Amino acid sequence: MTTRPHIAVIGAGAWGTALACATAATGADVTLWMRNPVPPRTRTLPRLPDITLPENVTITGDFPRTANVVLLVTPVQTARDVSTRLQTVLDPAVPVVTCCKGLEQATSLLPLDVLAETMPGRPTGVLSGPNFAIEVAKGLPAAATLACADLALAQKLTALLNTSSFRLYASDDAAGVQLAGAAKNVIAIGAGITIGAGLGENARAALITRAVAEIGRLAEATGGRASTLAGLAGMGDLILTCTGRGSRNYSVGLELGEGRPLADILASRTTVAEGVLTAPAMLALARKHNVRVPIIETVTRLLNDGVSIEEARHLLLDRPPTRE
């Protein structure tokens, strides 16, 4: 008798719940870890209340000791704490795949760099792509990139997690995939601002396109490949996050563009818009590597320095012309 694979999902927010549903479609036994667990037979969770969890998903408040793979689906800012505790109980051979997007605010570290400190020697990877949680949870067609420094591991994990509705592509550019996933949240805020402020579709298209070049420069400076920006984790995620109203970061930008104060926007939300915290950390990372990131810098100044939208417009458009 063949033993069914065991997949552990750490974090039961919207994306964690969606990934539990998606991976359950592989036929594996899925464990979904919650910080404050509900009764084990509960089939609906607060972040996606219209979704019924498959029967092969088990909810728990205990970290797994063994699994074929662990998906870490916590916010970036809590990944250090959770992964440190997970490391003490999890078999050292079990790979951990981070599914969060952003930079640790205090250190400007990408998620896998955090795991390198908290889980030294462990095989790790990153999963990222143009995915709204509710659509993945419903089983609608979607795709993403799973990247590991070891391509063979990435291929093994994509074979384990791939389904007929959630298609995964293997990559060995973990640095580029992470960087793209983090930066797109910042760019999405800028894209939302352009529409909310009535600057037009042309402005949004220009911002997204120039952001690809900007993120590509930063990816290369941090050990990634600019070519990764042409894939699902780059352009795919940018298009979705910068145009879809289901994007938390884009919707923050929309409200900012309409004139609502940032503090009021954040106070009214129960979910995290990672781009708000990632923006200053991303700018610090770019300055560390001497990379020009005018869009990221302008969004950061809008969020943190009181720069007006009109001033931001001139900061971007009044720069000397350059070649593309």
Curated annotation (Swiss-Prot):
Location in or out of the cell: Cytoplasm
Residues holding NADPH: 15, 35, 101, 133, 248, 272, 274
Enzyme Commission number: 1.1.1.94
Gene Ontology BP term (one): phospholipid biosynthetic process
UniProt catalytic activity: sn-glycerol 3-phosphate + NAD(+) = dihydroxyacetone phosphate + NADH + H(+); sn-glycerol 3-phosphate + NADP(+) = dihydroxyacetone phosphate + NADPH + H(+)
Pathway per the UniProt entry: Membrane lipid metabolism; glycerophospholipid metabolism
Keywords associated with the record: Cytoplasm, Lipid biosynthesis, Lipid metabolism, NAD, NADP, Nucleotide-binding, Oxidoreductase, Phospholipid biosynthesis, Phospholipid metabolism
Tree of life domain: Bacteria
Annotated catalytic residues: 184 (proton acceptor)
GO cellular component terms listed in the entry, alphabetical order: cytosol
Binding site for sn-glycerol 3-phosphate: 101, 129, 184, 237, 247-249
Any one GO molecular function term: glycerol-3-phosphate dehydrogenase [NAD(P)+] activity
Family according to the record: Belongs to the NAD-dependent glycerol-3-phosphate dehydrogenase family.
Summary of the function given for this chain in its UniProt record: Catalyzes the reduction of the glycolytic intermediate dihydroxyacetone phosphate (DHAP) to sn-glycerol 3-phosphate (G3P), the key precursor for phospholipid synthesis.
Protein name from the UniProt record: Glycerol-3-phosphate dehydrogenase [NAD(P)+]
Species for this entry: Gluconobacter oxydans (strain 621H)
Gene that produces this protein: gpsA
